[in-house]
Amino acid sequence: MSSGGLLLLLGLLTLCAELTPVSSRKRHPDCDKPPDTKICQTVVRAFYYKPSAKRCVQFRYGGCNGNGNHFKSDHLCRCECLEYR
């Protein structure tokens, strides 16, 4: 991995750590909503949290702004939706 890639990864991990309180935290309520797969604009790769699998899953997001359970990366999805104990 290039040094630029490592710096980006370090920055994302730092951001996730800063946004995650040290104490126990529950996931955002939008993380329990189903993915919005309607097509309104350009289709892009996105991730949503799948509660039954307890993980983030890739899907095709059509830009309809349906709910808050869509993220640009798996990392951002995990930061927002995984429970920390």
From Swiss-Prot:
Its main location: secreted. It comes from the Eukaryota. Expressed by the venom gland. Transmembrane segments: none annotated. It is found in: Secreted. GO terms for molecular function: potassium channel regulator activity; serine-type endopeptidase inhibitor activity; toxin activity. PROSITE patterns: BPTI_KUNITZ_1, BPTI_KUNITZ_2. SUPFAM superfamilies: BPTI-like (SSF57362). Keywords: Disulfide bond, Ion channel impairing toxin, Neurotoxin, Potassium channel impairing toxin, Presynaptic neurotoxin, Secreted, Signal, Toxin, Voltage-gated potassium channel impairing toxin. GO terms for cellular component: extracellular space. The keyword Disulfide bond applies. Residues 31-81 form the BPTI/Kunitz inhibitor domain. Residues 1-24 form the signal peptide. Heterodimer; disulfide-linked. The A chains have phospholipase A2 activity and the B chains show homology with the basic protease inhibitors. Beta-2-bungarotoxin is a presynaptic neurotoxin of the venom. The B chain is homologous to venom basic protease inhibitors but has no protease inhibitor activity and blocks voltage-gated potassium channels (Kv). Belongs to the venom Kunitz-type family. This is Kunitz-type serine protease inhibitor homolog beta-bungarotoxin B2 chain. It comes from Bungarus multicinctus.
